[in-house]
Design a protein with these regions (language model features):
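Short, conserved catalytic/metal-binding motifs centered on acidic residues
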Residues: 34-35, 51, 81-95, 123, ...
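Short amphipathic alpha-helical "interface-anchor" segments enriched in bulky aromatics
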Residues: 89-91, 319-351
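Basic, amphipathic alpha-helical segments enriched in Lys/Arg and hydrophobic/aromatic residues
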Residues: 346-403
Length: 411
């Protein structure tokens, strides 16, 4: 009941609760599909339009919901091992409609066809036991090219009537407003971190991300909060090596060939408890814009024949083991993406309204966390005999929720 205070009315809260449950249990995770599977008590059925209004149009705030969500999750990450916040972005595919908010056409290199997708910037916190989404922000659509083309086509050499001048000025101001309102993925990531640090629910959590969101503004903000970060960098990044600016790949190759002994063998315990062997070279170097940072070059084979991984951190006192162990917390956010897309309806909502899309992503995060907290049944079932006593698979949790839902219908 921690989320009840977010909603104005009991009926609205009940509709949202049904929607979250439907995101986990319904095969069709749209509101239409969820509503179609609800078994209403006699005399209590409401229209689908009423449920739609309660979930997507009522006066509750998705921002307040996520603040409550983050505050509710915070105790789960205290005293249960190290916690690290991961930052990333993902694509939510909508191949059948360009009218969904934020969906834009692009070529899908996986399926080798044109498709539509939303760009969603996410943040997730992870410890050795679980991973939870903390933020999901959809990138607003960018229509600058179309608007600029329209302005070029409708341009006139002179305007005889004041009404024409006012109309043209209004069009130019709208274009300027949209241009200023355009937000890059990296800017959205900075805003998310600023919000997380302002709330202060995860004071001990460092950050891990890759070069897709790495910017000077982001690292400066994290460092100003007294925290550390680890990021993978591209192999063409320039570093100051022996008095000259060189690409990190040009630094790594001579080291591998001429001084293989500089790569120290280490055994690192990763986030999931797995022990991994690495061969690492670590040194504090200077980078353009970022200043002095620790560079760690990682190989995972003893003969150094694999492609190296280049990690960068502001923690100058960390060794290669600590840096790589922190970097292992970057991958749970990929698990969160898969989890949310396949089990919590991240890509299911066919909504054209900006507020409705944001609410759906927030409720998907809530559903993903709710599933991890569900109590388990059926330990002695043959279906789950592969799991030991300490494991509680996601399938078993969904099985428990489905049984509870059926039991409520029967009763």
């Amino acid at each position: 009941m921690a989320y009840r205070e977010v909603f104005c009315r009991d009926n609205g809260f009940e509709h949202v609760s049904r929607y979250v449950q439907g995101l986990l249990l319904s095969a069709n995770k749209t509101l239409q599909g969820i509503y179609a599977q609800i078994v209403w008590p006699e005399g209590e059925q409401v229209s689908r339009r009423a449920m739609h209004a309660a979930v997507f149009e009522a006066g509750w705030s998705h921002e307040e919901l996520m603040r409550t969500h983050r505050r509710t999750l915070a105790p789960q990450y205290r005293g249960r091992g190290r916690a690290v916040i991961g930052l990333d972005w993902t694509l939510a595919y909508h191949p059948y409609s360009e009218k969904i908010y934020g969906a834009k056409p692009a070529y899908d290199y996986v399926h080798r066809c044109w498709s539509c997708y939303q760009t969603v910037v996410t943040a997730a916190v992870a410890n050795p036991h679980r991973v939870d989404g903390l933020a999901a922000e959809v990138q607003p659509p960018n229509y600058q090219k179309a608007e600029l083309a329209y302005l070029a086509v409708t341009q006139q050499e002179s305007y005889e009537q004041m009404e024409q001048v006012q109309t043209r000025l209004s069009e130019l101001l709208h274009y300027h407003q949209h241009r200023l309102g355009d937000r890059k993925r990296t800017e959205m990531a900075v805003d998310i971190v600023r919000q997380l640090e302002a709330e202060g629910d995860y004071p001990q959590a460092d950050y891990a991300f890759d070069q897709g969101v790495l910017t000077h503004a982001l690292t400066t903000l994290i460092e100003s909060a007294g925290k550390h970060w680890v990021s993978e960098i591209e192999r063409t990044r320039l570093v100051l090596w022996k008095g000259q600016w060189q690409q990190v790949q040009m630094v790594a190759e001579p080291l591998r060939k001429d001084h293989p002994e500089s790569f120290r063998h280490k055994k690192v315990r990763c986030r999931n408890g797995e022990m991994r062997e690495i061969w690492a070279f670590s040194k504090v170097l200077r980078l353009k814009k970022y200043g002095r940072k620790r560079l760690v070059i990682i190989h995972e084979t003893a003969d150094l024949s694999d492609t190296p991984r280049f990690l960068l951190t502001d923690a100058l006192h960390w060794d290669a083991s600590r840096t790589f162990a922190t970097w292992s917390f970057r991958w749970p956010i990929e698990t969160f993406h898969q989890f949310a897309k396949h089990l919590a309806g991240f890509e299911a909502a066919q909504l054209r309204n900006q507020e409705a899309v944001k609410r759906h992503f927030c409720l998907s995060c809530v559903a993903q966390s709710a599933l991890q907290q569900a109590s388990c049944q059926g330990q002695k079932s043959e279906r789950f005999e592969f799991a030991d006593e300490s494991q509680q698979p996601i399938g078993q949790r969904r099985y428990s929720l489905a049984r509870e839902a059926v039991q409520q219908v029967v009763e």
